[in-house]
């Protein structure tokens, strides 16, 4: 769930934002972030003590004469801390050598405001509920696999972002985020056979650890791991694997920074057919399957727009700074300007597939013979402009024979073009899954897909 609120009568409702803006006479904006989290971890089939975390900080940007910008952040919200924050940002701006194209921040907006009756998160109650849910999940696994080992995590949080600027724009959004994942290993064989499942939702009932445990268990074949030689294989990619690839594509090719520096595939392929024509991908910040987030860190609405329209690549994501440099409107994709996100620039964080029609079983039937890859990790770029990445399969890599999962296979290193995978995609699953990181920053909503001729460059024995 999300709640978005404007300031009352155009005045800042957030006193922290007001206090900071009152200390400068220059164009400026403020982001005030408050986060409350519960994290429950599982290891060796045991529940670890829940961790409660509360964070509050602000970041401040200012433009001084000469169009020079400075940025500072702090967790000290005292008067002294705020004075230091503003002084530091203004000093940084005056020492900057590179003017920005942005001359002023946007004024009050007239966007539709969505009220969803978002309730405050009671972390104490959630901790009790999560512990019961985790115990039930562990019991489910123990009954199915008495010699199993379970690890995982459950996160629940409420995040409020308030953005205000010197031009009179004041917006805030509150989000509830629930995320969970489980790794199940069958220790009766050596090396252990593993299964993985995950999920994320803005609804507390949308992430159930027992249901995640069931999904992790249902595909584990009770056979020993067999090695598989490197080569080209037909593959059904699970949603977690596709989510990892979409996050890489977003960071490496769908943002304005990568277009500016010439490392994005969009430099050559914009408005051309780039992936399979039956695929349409959106940036959809309001998709109910995902983690709705109606505004960005500039305080602007994140636009619902097509990233690929029936295979044709569209334009990159923009924030205020990159949009000003090329004279186009922002798409509402600003990330926090401070590290570690500032170096990424604006990127889509809610990549959403239009669903296909195939069930999981139908995808395996169409695959016939090949590999089911549930998950990828350690994915890194080899050639950014060609979207070539390399990464390892992990936790749920199975050989499929005659359309059925037959046995687990040792992990493989995939070296492939992300666009090539999407270009050779033959079928798309009908079921969509939100696969978010633990804090809900990136939250793609993706299906399983069937792709032909995926290159695996090396293999392991485990």
Show the residue positions of the predicted features.
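Amphipathic alpha-helical
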Residues: 255-276
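A generic local secondary-structure boundary/capping motif
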Residues: 18-20, 47-51, 125, 137-144, ...
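Acidic low-complexity segments
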Residues: 2-7, 11-17, 24-39, 84-173, ...
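Short beta-strand elements
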Residues: 52-64, 171-199, 307-309, 395-402
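Dual-mode signal for accessory low-complexity, basic/Gly-rich regions
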Residues: 110, 269-462
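Short acidic, glycine/serine/threonine-rich loops at helix termini
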Residues: 40-44, 158-176, 192-198, 245-251, ...
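Structured beta-strand/loop patches that form or line metal/cofactor-binding pockets in enzymes
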Residues: 22-58, 150-171, 368-393
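N-terminal alpha-helical targeting/anchoring segments
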Residues: 38-94
